[in-house]
Amino acid sequence: RYFVLRNYEKLPAQNIGKDVDIIVEPSRLKEAKRILKSIYRNNGLLYYDEAVFDRLNCTHGMGIENHTGIHIDLIGGYLVRGYEIYTFEELYAHTKWYNGFCVLDEFFDGIMLFIYKQFGYGTPKLKEKYKDGIYNTYKKYPKEFQEEIARITSSAFAEKMVDHIEKK
């Protein structure tokens, strides 16, 4: 079991991000890595490199002859600064199929964008596309959004965040 975390909208024809993040069941991470290596190899990406940080495997497949490079992050579950806010099972319960890929549903896609950008992102200034994604999710699911942020943080924090989001 797996899902693509974000930037999946134009896959497989085009990647709109710098990489593709694939969240896999933690117990299947080694198997996912083996499958990914064979996919790279079968598509002419014969040079393989990876950097491993705990459950994050940053993989690069490169093909000299076809001048192609692909960066896919395989992640066993989802951690933010070492903290597991949601288990793989909790996240997987909020997935759907989109263009042949398993992805988060609309609500959780927005929640995870908020969590990643709020707690795990190094740059304090949000890009407009991220602001828009968070804002649109909040506007479509205001009660659920605030309740979920309050559940994983606190009611006071959720209120402050909603105030900021509403001001966009």
Model-inferred region functions:
Residues 1-20, 24-168:
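Conserved NTP-donor binding/palm subdomain of two-metal-ion nucleotidyltransferases/polymerases, i.e.
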